[in-house]
From Swiss-Prot:
GO terms for cellular component: Cul4-RING E3 ubiquitin ligase complex; nucleolus; small-subunit processome. InterPro entries: Sof1 (IPR007287), WD40/YVTN_repeat-like_dom_sf (IPR015943), WD40_repeat_CS (IPR019775), WD40_repeat_dom_sf (IPR036322), WD40_rpt (IPR001680), WD_repeat_DCAF13/WDSOF1 (IPR051733). Part of the small subunit (SSU) processome, first precursor of the small eukaryotic ribosomal subunit. During the assembly of the SSU processome in the nucleolus, many ribosome biogenesis factors, an RNA chaperone and ribosomal proteins associate with the nascent pre-rRNA and work in concert to generate RNA folding, modifications, rearrangements and cleavage as well as targeted degradation of pre-ribosomal RNA by the RNA exosome. Substrate-recognition component of a DCX (DDB1-CUL4-X-box) E3 ubiquitin-protein ligase complex. Belongs to the WD repeat DCAF13/WDSOF1 family. This is DDB1- and CUL4-associated factor 13. SUPFAM superfamilies: WD40 repeat-like. Pathway: Protein modification; protein ubiquitination. It comes from the Eukaryota. Residues 353-441 are annotated as: Required for nucleolar location. Pfam families: Sof1, WD40. One of its GO terms (molecular function) is ubiquitin-like ligase-substrate adaptor activity. Part of the small subunit (SSU) processome, composed of more than 70 proteins and the RNA chaperone small nucleolar RNA (snoRNA) U3. Component of the DCX(DCAF13) E3 ubiquitin ligase complex, at least composed of CUL4 (CUL4A or CUL4B), DDB1, DCAF13 and RBX1. Keywords: Nucleus, Repeat, Ribonucleoprotein, Ribosome biogenesis, rRNA processing, Ubl conjugation pathway, WD repeat.
Length: 445
């Protein structure tokens, strides 16, 4: 006689220790879960609400400067070290872990106009209103030693910006022209110029390291190649560009911060129209910096706010502001992609989280899995009206809120006027110009 018996493997359901979780048998057949999507929607809604509840982005304020913070630089090798230069010529080096100043030195008379660290992290360069370029050791001087620069170069004109090559002992300064310097020489290797207006910013490309871009006060963005003696090309915009930043992951992409409240992301091969126009600020954009991932960038504006933009979106995903923060002059995204630093003209440097609701510290494996699951749910249901409304909601200062409202009315009036003009004109006489091409005056090769 044959007898059928149930045979179970204890390893499938018995815990090894009392601390282990009970194993729950699950059947993933969709026919048994008709309300799966509805449950996921509720979970996504709750996750979105909790994200807004836990959004506490502000971490710390680094105070110590006695004048407005004019520029900042990141240490290329150390995540916890950042440098800042003020309007009174003082340079401070900060430890972000301890959130305190570890070194202060009087670098220049007048403004510190620009600063950058050497690619190996052993020294840094500063330029100021006193027409000098100075190289300083990154380490503090020993006991009894005086704080002296390694090299000092006295120029003929005021330098307004500086940036270091990503691989070689070469740096570039800008003022009346773009000068390329060797660290061992006191005169520039070559000088590049196109036009007669002063240049406010110069930046090396981190991937194609021989390329650099500059912003001039005559509304030009000029691109150069160090290997040839003449500039490559330039694009002229409606208003002046304050600074630009290259995408660290895509060699030909850069973003320009403009006086017309917008940021423009360009592909340097096709300058006739920007890849994307980023608009949300209500005053001039003064600085921009990319995330190390190249997916997002942060901008600082004269409207006393900091905004985070996805590269492929026209509007910001996040806006940071405080009651005491004044005009934000400079901004940096840390090299671990988790924090943002901004320097403003009321003498403070502020440290923010890049993701406002991110939990800091070590996460348990279950906690990490739950966060990843919630993130996927939010992405899945991000276009549902209720979830979209909660995720986009932000509290803004009254001044910014009123200016946004005013800008919206003005934009709508311009659009209406253009439609009326086209309607009452001869067909084809009033061409349709896209938002991307409206702001480009000309491209000169």
């Amino acid at each position: 006689m044959r007898v059928k018996v149930l045979s179970r493997n204890p390893d499938d359901y018995v815990r090894e220790t009392k601390l282990d979780l009970q194993r729950v048998p699950r059947n993933y057949d969709p026919a048994l879960h008709p309300f799966e999507v509805a449950r996921e929607y509720v979970r996504a809604l709750n996750a979105t609400k909790l994200e807004r509840v836990f959004a506490k982005p502000f971490l710390s304020s680094l105070d110590g400067h006695r004048d407005g913070v004019n520029c900042m630089a990141k240490h290329p090798k150390s995540l916890s070290t950042v440098l800042s230069g003020a309007c009174d010529g003082e340079v401070r080096i900060w430890n972000l872990t301890k959130r305190q100043c570890i070194r202060a030195l009087q670098a220049h008379e007048g403004f510190v106009r620009g600063m950058c660290a050497r690619f190996c992290g052993t020294s840094f360069f500063t330029v100021g209103d006193d027409k000098t370029v100075k190289q300083w050791k990154m380490e503090s001087p020993g006991y009894g030693e005086e704080e002296e620069p390694i090299h000092t170069i006295l120029g003929k004109t005021v330098y307004t910006g500086i940036d270091h090559h990503w691989k070689d002992a070469v740096f570039a300064t800008c003022g009346q022209q773009v000068d390329i310097w060797d660290e061992q020489r006191t005169s520039p290797m070559c000088s590049l110029t196109w036009g007669f207006d002063s240049i406010s910013s110069v930046k090396f490309n981190p991937i194609e390291t021989y390329l650099l871009g500059s912003c001039a006060s005559d509304r030009n963005i000029v691109l150069y190649d160090m290997r040839q003696s003449t500039p490559l090309k330039k694009v002229i915009l409606n208003m002046r560009t304050n600074t630009l930043c290259w995408n660290p992951m895509e060699a030909f992409i850069f973003t320009a911060a403009n006086e017309d409240y917008n940021l423009y992301t360009f592909d340097m091969r096709f300058l006739t129209s920007p890849v994307m126009v980023h608009m949300d600020h209500v005053s001039a954009v003064l600085d921009v910096d990319y995330s190390p991932t190249g997916k997002e960038f942060v901008s600082a504006s004269f409207d006393k706010s900091v905004r985070i933009f996805p590269v492929d979106k026209g509007h910001s995903r996040e806006v940071y502001h405080t009651k005491r923060m004044q005009h934000v002059i400079t901004v940096k995204w840390t090299s671990d992609s988790r924090y943002i630093l901004c320097g403003s003209d009321e003498m403070n440097i502020r440290l923010w989280k890049a993701n406002a609701s991110e939990k800091l510290g070590v996460l348990a494996p279950r906690e990490k899995a739950a966060m990843n699951y919630n993130q996927k749910l939010k992405e899945k249901f991000q276009h549902h009206p209720q979830i979209k409304r909660i995720a986009r909601h932000r509290h803004l200062p009254k001044s910014i809120y009123c200016q946004i409202k005013e800008q919206r009315i003005m934009r709508e009036a311009r659009r209406r006027k253009e439609l009326n003009r086209r309607k009452h004109s001869k067909p084809g006489s009033v061409p349709v110009v896209s938002e991307k091409k409206k702001h480009i005056v000309a491209v000169v090769q």
